[in-house]
Amino acid sequence: MASLYEMVWRFLHALLYLQRAIVAWFRVHIWRWKLAVVDLLLPLALGFHNQKKTGPKGTRTSRRVRWGADGRTLEKLPLHVGLLVTEEEIHYTDIANLVVWCMAVGISYVSVYDNQGVFKRNNSRLMEEILKQQQELLGMGSSKYSVEILKNGTNKQEHQVLSCQSMVKVLSPDDGRLSIVQAAQQLCRAVEQKEKTSKDINVSVLDSLLKESKNIPDPDLVLKFGTVQSTLGFLPWHIRLTEIISMPSHIDASYDDLYDALQRFAGCEQRLGK
C-alpha cells in the first residue's frame, strides 16, 4: 500500500510540474504573439512605407532622436536600471539591445545579473555584443553613447570606448552575499582594533560601506525577466527601495517593452515606508 501511495504522489507531483511548465510556455508565447501583432500593425499605422525611403542611415538617426526624446519626456528617469534574468536560456543579443536602449534614453548605469553567474563568466562576450548592437542600432551616432564595464570592487574599467557616458556592471550572487560579509568583517576588525565601538555600528555605517564596494548608486528600477517570483539574490541590501517590474522574458524584448516599463516607473510614487 505504501508503494501505491508513493506512485500516486509521484504522479501528482509530475502532473503539477507539467502544468506549471505548460502555463509558463503559454505565457511567454502569448506575449510573443501579441508583440508580433503589434509589429505587424504598427508600421502600417505610422506609414512605414515612407520611412523606407530614408534608408538604414536615416532610420538609425530617426530612432536615435526618438529614443533620446523619449527619455527627456519622462517625468522621472532612473539613474540606475538593473536587468535581472531569471530564465535558464540566455540571449546575449537581446540583453545587449536592452543595454543600448537604456543608454539611448539617458540612463547612466545598467547592471546585468543572472543567478548562475553566466554573464559574469562571459563578460567579454557581453561587451562585444553591446558594442555590436550599439553600432547596429545607433549607427554613426554611437560614439555619443560610450559604455564601459566596471570591475567589481575597483574604480578601474575592463573595457572603455572613448569618453564614458554609461556604465555597465555585470553581477552574480556573490556580489550580493560577499559584499555584506566583507563589510561586516571590516566593521568587526575596526571594533577589534578599537577604531570603532559597537555603538558606532548602525545601518547607515553598513550602508556606506556597501555603497563604496559597488562604485555605482543603488538601482532605482529592476526589470525582472522570467516567471520566477524571486530576485534570486540580486543585491539584497541595495534594492530595499527599488521599484521592481516583472516582464515575461528578455528574449525578443522590444524597445517599446522597455519604454513601457520606464513609463510605469515614472508614474510610481515612492512612499519610503510611509
Swiss-Prot record:
Family matches, as InterPro entries: Nus1/NgBR (IPR038887), UPP_synth-like (IPR001441), UPP_synth-like_sf (IPR036424)
Coiled-coil segments: none
EC number: 2.5.1.87
GO cellular component, one term: endoplasmic reticulum membrane
UniProt keyword annotations, A-Z: Endoplasmic reticulum, Glycoprotein, Magnesium, Membrane, Receptor, Transferase, Transmembrane, Transmembrane helix
Pathway: Protein modification; protein glycosylation
GO terms of biological process kind: dolichol biosynthetic process; intracellular cholesterol transport; protein glycosylation; sprouting angiogenesis; swimming behavior
Required co-factors: Mg(2+)
Functional summary from the UniProt entry: With DHDDS, forms the dehydrodolichyl diphosphate synthase (DDS) complex, an essential component of the dolichol monophosphate (Dol-P) biosynthetic machinery. Adds multiple copies of isopentenyl pyrophosphate (IPP) to farnesyl pyrophosphate (FPP) to produce dehydrodolichyl diphosphate (Dedol-PP), a precursor of dolichol which is utilized as a sugar carrier in protein glycosylation in the endoplasmic reticulum (ER). Regulates the glycosylation and stability of nascent NPC2, thereby promoting trafficking of LDL-derived cholesterol.
Additional detail: Nus1 seems to exist in two topological orientations, a minor glycosylated species with its C-terminus oriented towards the lumen regulating NPC2 stability, and a major fraction oriented with its C-terminus directed towards the cytosol where it regulates cis-IPTase activity.
Similarity comment: family membership: Belongs to the UPP synthase family.
Protein's UniProt name: Dehydrodolichyl diphosphate synthase complex subunit nus1
The organism's taxonomic lineage, starting at the top: Eukaryota, Metazoa, Chordata, Craniata, Vertebrata
Gene name per UniProt: nus1
